[in-house]
C-alpha cells in the first residue's frame, strides 16, 4: 500500500531531481553512540536479540529520527543475516565481533551453500520492514521519511564467510581467491542470487530504497575488484525490482576505498554511488557526469571536533558538490560509537541550513 511521504527529499535526490536542500542520513545512525540504543540493546540481551526481534529493530530504527530531523530511516539489521540464514552459525563474541561456527573453506563447504528461503529464514527482517513502515506513518496515512533496506555485497559477505569472522589482512579469503578462483566464483554466485532475493523481499515488504554495502571491496587489487566484487554487484543490481507500489525504488552501492573505480561503479545500473572521505566530491561529480547521484562523504572523525569545526567541514563538503541535483549527504563510513550525540545535531542542522542557502543563491560555492 502506497503512503504519502511528508518528506521525499532523499528519494528525489537519489533520482537526481531538484530539492530545496541536501538530504542527510548517516550510516549506522541507529547505534551505540545513542544512550537510548544501548538501553534497548540491554533489554534485548544481545545484538542478535535486538536484530532478530522486529519490535526492538523498529524501536532502534526510529531512535535517531526522534533526536534529529534526518531525511531517511534505515532498517536496523546486520549484513551477516544472509550467511547466517545459509546455516553458517553466526554469533557475536564480546570484544571480537562476529564469528561463524561453520566457515566456508573447502569444496564440500561450497557445495553445501545454497540461496536460503528468505521467507522461512529471514522473516524477522521483512517483518521489521513492515513494522517500521507502519511506525513511520501517521493516522492519515502520511509517512515521515522513506525507509532504506540494505545488504552486504557478495564479496563482502564472502570475506566473513571464508575468514569465519572479521580479518585484518583477509589472508584466508584472498588465498582462496588466488589459489581456487573457481571456488570463490561459486561462493559469489550463490551470494549474488541470495542478496538479490533478500533485497527484493525487503522491497516487497516496503523498503523504498536499497543499499549494497561493499565494505571490503577496497581490499582488492585493481582488476581483481572488477572480477570478484563489481561483477557480482552488477549481477545483484540487474535482478532487483526497481518499481514497487507505482514508485521507483532507487539503488545505492558503496565500496569503501573504491574511489579509483567510481566510473565503473557508476556503470552498474545503480542510481547512486556512496563515497568515502578520500574522494574529492567535486571531481567525482565531474567524473560521473550526472549519470548517478552521489552520497557522502564527510570523515566520521569530524564529529569529534568542536561544533564550529563540524559546521565548517560540512559546508566544505556541500560547497564541493555545489548547487547541483543528486547529492545525499552522509558520512564516508559508519558513525563511531564514541561520537557525542549533540555533535550529530550540529552536523544535521548545518547541512540543512547551508544547503538551503546554496539553493537560494544566498551562498555561492567557491
From Swiss-Prot:
Residues where substrate binds: 28-32, 78, 160, 215, 333
Catalytic reactions of this protein: uroporphyrinogen III + 4 H(+) = coproporphyrinogen III + 4 CO2
GO biological process entries: protoporphyrinogen IX biosynthetic process from glutamate
Function (record text): Catalyzes the decarboxylation of four acetate groups of uroporphyrinogen-III to yield coproporphyrinogen-III.
Name assigned to this protein: Uroporphyrinogen decarboxylase
Predominant location category: cytoplasm
Source organism of this protein record: Paraburkholderia xenovorans (strain LB400)
The entry's keywords: Cytoplasm, Decarboxylase, Lyase, Porphyrin biosynthesis
Gene encoding the protein: hemE
Compartment(s) where it occurs, according to its Swiss-Prot or TrEMBL record: Cytoplasm
Associated pathway: Porphyrin-containing compound metabolism; protoporphyrin-IX biosynthesis; coproporphyrinogen-III from 5-aminolevulinate: step 4/4
InterPro entries: UROD/MetE-like_sf, Uroporphyrinogen_deCO2ase_HemE, Uroporphyrinogen_deCOase
Annotated site location: Transition state stabilizer: 78
Family from the record: Belongs to the uroporphyrinogen decarboxylase family.
Pfam families (UniProt xref): URO-D (PF01208)
Self-association and partners: Homodimer.
One GO cellular component term noted in the UniProt record for this chain: cytosol
Family annotation (Gene3D superfamilies): 3.20.20.210
EC number: 4.1.1.37
GO molecular function: uroporphyrinogen decarboxylase activity
Keyword Lyase attached: yes
Intrachain S-S bonds: none
Amino acid at each position: 500500500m502506497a503512503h504519502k511521504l511528508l518528506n521525499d527529499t532523499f528519494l528525489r535526490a537519489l533520482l537526481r531531481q531538484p530539492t530545496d536542500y541536501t538530504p542527510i542520513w548517516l550510516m549506522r545512525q541507529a547505534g551505540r553512540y545513542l544512550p537510548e540504543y544501548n538501553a534497548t540493546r540491554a533489554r534485548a540481551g544481545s545484538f542478535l536479540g535486538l536484530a532478530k526481534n522486529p519490535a526492538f529493530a523498529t524501536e532502534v530504527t526510529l531512535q535517531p529520527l526522534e533526536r534529529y530531523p534526518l531525511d531517511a530511516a534505515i532498517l536496523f539489521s546486520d549484513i551477516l543475516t544472509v550467511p547466517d540464514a545459509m546455516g553458517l552459525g553466526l554469533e557475536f563474541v564480546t570484544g571480537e565481533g562476529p564469528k561463524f561456527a561453520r566457515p566456508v573453506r573447502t569444496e564440500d563447504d561450497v557445495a553445501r551453500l545454497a540461496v536460503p528461503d528468505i521467507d522461512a529464514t529471514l522473516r524477522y527482517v521483512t517483518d521489521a520492514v513492515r513494522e517500521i513502515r507502519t511506525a513511520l506513518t501517521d493516522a492519515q496515512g502520511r509517512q515521515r521519511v522513506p525507509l532504506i533496506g540494505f545488504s552486504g555485497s557478495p564479496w563482502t559477505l564472502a570475506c566473513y564467510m571464508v575468514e569465519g569472522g572479521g580479518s585484518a589482512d583477509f589472508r584466508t579469503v584472498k588465498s582462496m581467491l588466488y589459489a581456487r578462483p573457481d571456488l570463490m566464483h561459486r561462493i559469489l554466485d550463490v551470494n549474488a542470487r541470495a542478496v538479490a532475493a533478500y533485497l527484493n523481499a525487503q522491497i516487497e515488504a516496503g523498503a523504498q530504497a536499497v543499499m549494497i554495502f561493499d565494505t571490503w571491496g577496497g581490499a582488492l587489487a585493481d582488476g581483481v575488484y572488477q572480477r570478484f566484487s563489481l561483477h557480482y554487484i552488477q549481477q545483484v543490481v540487474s535482478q532487483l525490482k526497481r518499481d514497487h507500489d507505482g514508485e521507483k525504488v532507487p539503488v545505492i552501492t558503496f565500496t569503501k576505498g573504491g574511489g579509483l573505480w567510481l566510473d565503473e561503479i557508476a556503470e552498474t545500473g545503480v542510481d547512486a554511488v556512496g563515497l568515502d572521505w578520500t574522494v574529492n566530491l567535486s571531481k567525482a561529480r565531474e567524473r560521473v557526469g550526472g549519470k548517478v547521484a552521489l552520497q557522502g562523504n564527510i570523515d566520521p572523525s569530524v564529529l569529534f571536533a568542536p561544533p564550529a569545526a563540524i559546521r565548517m567541514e560540512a559546508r566544505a563538503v556541500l560547497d564541493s558538490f555545489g548547487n547541483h541535483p543528486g547529492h545525499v549527504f552522509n558520512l564516508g563510513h559508519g558513525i563511531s560509537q564514541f561520537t557525542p550525540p549533540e555533535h550529530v545535531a550540529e552536523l544535521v542542522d548545518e547541512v540543512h541550513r547551508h544547503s538551503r542557502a546554496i539553493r537560494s543563491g544566498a551562498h555561492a560555492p567557491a
